[in-house]
Design a protein with these regions (language model features):
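GAF sensory/regulatory domain recognition
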Residues: 40, 52-96, 238, 242, ...
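Signal-transmission linkers at sensory-effector interfaces
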Residues: 1-37, 48, 179-189
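A short, aliphatic-rich beta-strand micro-motif
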Residues: 127-135
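Metal-dependent catalytic cores of enzymes that make or break cyclic nucleotides
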Residues: 110, 196-391
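Regulatory sensory and allosteric helical modules in signal-transduction proteins
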Residues: 76-122
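Signal-transmission/dimerization alpha-helices at domain junctions
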Residues: 1-4, 41, 101, 137, ...
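Regulatory loop-to-helix N-cap segments in sensory/regulatory domains
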Residues: 2-6, 141, 147-163, 173-176, ...
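Amphipathic alpha-helical coiled-coil segments that mediate homodimerization
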Residues: 17-23, 27-46, 54-56, 208-215, ...
Length: 391
């Protein structure tokens, strides 16, 4: 077990604040709103007034998925909550591998060739496109897409004017993502150097993160969740049980039911997780960590229950942050359907039945319904991140 020391003053501050969920609504629009402001600034240049859309798509190498992230659009955003396999997009795949830029000054011709993304862009009025891969030091992050309602907009003079803005946007995105990755790497090191041998396998964390994403995408229309919210929840969900590194192995790995005293010790991992992440953010100078309130809320409240019977604060209903309610369903589902030394894995249907039976009491009904409605996605995740293959 790792011994992480927290001063009395630090502990009091954490415990005083953690019982009240941190507001996340405004923070979730952080990078997107900055992009909107920059878009307005760009259009202030008379020669660039026809730039009608800026969008970022991120790449998940482990699943070969290119997914929409943030955008600033004058008209509709036809590609929100979209994903596609990069390997099935030859043009973008080549661009990611070779670098360079791609200019398409007549999207209608591309749409006639049956390209789905081009068809959707044209249907929303866009007529030209300019694509820039976001990459640095051998790492590929995704793409920057620029679009105009005008056919032939991206001329050589326009591209010359746009180049510094494109580089600035790419740098902003990479800096934000690098901050998140730094936190993830630090947590991974903590797990590795501690003596804890918990059940948080790499495959479990990969699956759990993708289940949270699947749930969030289903909930997006009803709750008004943008791609930025979905992406950061995907990034932060695997850190939910960070505090378990402070739980003794004989309790954490016990194959039988815990005694009341042992369960009280186990429950302490929530507060410890918040303490640890607060200290890491402070000590590592990560105060700019994007959407820190979301991360903190996931760690602090994913063991709360809709009827108030959860721990450690006894919150109920919508007092529990949505991100924590989503993470709770994803975490329990993967625990049920995973093999453990003391149990066989449940079938998906059996796990769904249990979640449904506790919908509205333990779990958010919307989150349960969203997961159950993602059967095909769940199957793909389980096949791709099988314990025997991924770990």
């Amino acid at each position: 077990m790792m011994n992480i020391k927290v001063s009395d003053d630090q502990a009091k501050t954490v415990k005083h604040n953690v019982g009240v969920p941190m507001p996340t609504t405004a923070a979730h629009r952080g990078l997107a709103e900055r992009l909107i402001c920059l878009h307005d600034e760009i259009k202030g240049d008379d020669s660039l007034g026809g730039l009608n859309r800026i969008a970022i798509a991120l790449y998940d190498e482990s699943s070969d998925i290119l997914k929409t992230f943030i955008h600033s659009s004058d008209g509709d955003n036809p590609l929100e909550h979209s994903t596609a396999k990069l390997s099935e997009m030859p043009g973008l795949k080549l661009l990611a591998r070779m670098g360079g830029r791609r200019t398409l000054n007549d999207l209608e011709k591309v749409a006639l060739a049956g390209r789905d993304h081009a068809i959707r862009l044209v249907a929303s009025g866009y007529r030209s496109s300019y694509t820039v891969p976001i990459q640095s030091k051998g790492m590929f992050y995704g793409f920057l897409f620029l679009n105009s309602f005008e056919t032939g907009f991206f001329t050589a003079p326009v591209l010359h004017r746009l180049r510094p803005y494109a580089e600035l946007i790419a740098q902003i995105v990479m800096r934000e993502l690098d901050t998140v990755r730094m936190m993830q790497a630090a947590v991974k090191v903590i797990r590795q150097v501690s003596t804890v041998r918990d059940e948080e396998t790499g495959a479990h964390l990969a699956r759990m993160a993708r289940y949270t994403r699947a749930i969030a995408l289903k909930l997006a229309p009803r709750y008004g969740l943008n791609d930025e919210f979905v992406e950061y929840l995907f990034q932060f969900a695997p850190l939910h049980d960070l505090g378990k590194i402070s739980v003794p192995d004989h309790i954490l790995l016990k194959p039988a039911r815990l005694t009341p005293q042992e369960f009280n010790i186990m429950k302490g991992h929530v507060a410890r997780g918040v303490e640890i992440v607060d200290l890491m953010v402070g000590d590592m100078g990560l105060q700019s960590l994007p959407h820190f309130p979301m991360l903190r809320n996931v760690i602090a409240y994913h063991h709360e229950a809709m009827d108030g019977s959860g721990y450690p604060y006894g919150l109920s209903g919508e007092a529990i942050p949505l991100e924590a309610r989503i993470a709770a369903v994803a975490d329990v589902f993967d625990a049920l359907t995973s093999a453990r030394p003391y149990k066989e894995p449940w079938t998906n249907d059996k796990a769904f039945d249990l979640l449904r039976s506790q919908s509205g009491t333990k779990f958010d009904p919307d989150c349960v319904a969203a997961l159950v409605d993602s059967v095909a996605t769940i199957g793909d995740i389980q096949a791709r991140f099988d314990e025997t293959v991924y770990d």
